[in-house]
Curated annotation (Swiss-Prot):
Coiled coil regions, renumbered to chain: none
Family: Belongs to the GrpE family.
Protein name per the record: GrpE protein homolog, mitochondrial
Protein purpose: Essential component of the PAM complex, a complex required for the translocation of transit peptide-containing proteins from the inner membrane into the mitochondrial matrix in an ATP-dependent manner. Seems to control the nucleotide-dependent binding of mitochondrial HSP70 to substrate proteins.
The protein's assembly and partners: Probable component of the PAM complex at least composed of a mitochondrial HSP70 protein, Roe1, TIM44, blp/TIM16 and TIM14.
GO molecular function: adenyl-nucleotide exchange factor activity; protein homodimerization activity; protein-folding chaperone binding; unfolded protein binding
Region (Disordered) location: 35-55
Keywords associated with the record: Chaperone, Mitochondrion, Transit peptide
Origin: domain of life: Eukaryota
Gene transcribed to yield this protein: Roe1
InterPro entries: GrpE (IPR000740), GrpE_coiled_coil (IPR013805), GrpE_head (IPR009012)
BP-aspect Gene Ontology terms: protein import into mitochondrial matrix; protein refolding
UniProt entry tagged with the keyword Ribonucleoprotein: no
Amino acid sequence: MSAKAALPLQMFGRRLVHLRSSVTSQNMSALRLYSTEKQPEEATEQKATESSPEVEKLTKELAAAKEQNAELMDKYKRSLADSENMRNRLNKQISDAKIFGIQSFCKDLLEVADTLGHATQAVPKDKLSGNADLKNLYEGLTMTRASLLQVFKRHGLEPLDPINQKFDPNQHEALFQKEDKTVEPNTVVEVTKLGYKLHERCIRPALVGVSKC
């Protein structure tokens, strides 16, 4: 083979060797890149796999803590409501004790008012003009009773005069029935004794007569 014919062959061989070297170098670079990229992914997957039980445990503990917190909050709200109700009941009892503590004393004074009322009614009205002493006595009784009723009113004690009202068993005590066509049945047509209430509480029912049904 001549030198001119061998020269192209040598150049082709050199190109082939260079090409193989280049391909091998690229493959190695790709392999290294693949290995470098894959290692973090595998490490992440392995780490996630290893941490899954711990995450699950923490999730369960968090759920249990939330449930316990909800139960404690519910108990706290119930206790707070119970305390508020108890405080309101106690305040009402104290208020009632202040208001109705004089109830028995008021009942005793009612007898005095009744006596003054009976005495006033017993005075013959037709003789007042001709008897100055009787007139002064009548006026004195009337003024005394009026003053006593004013004291009652200042302390929340007021009379109950249910004439012509519908009979109420909570405030009235029926002593008898009476025929009366001018009113509806079960109406108070006569009051023999006034009732009294202390701050809207009836402490003595009125003694009454009612119309027949």
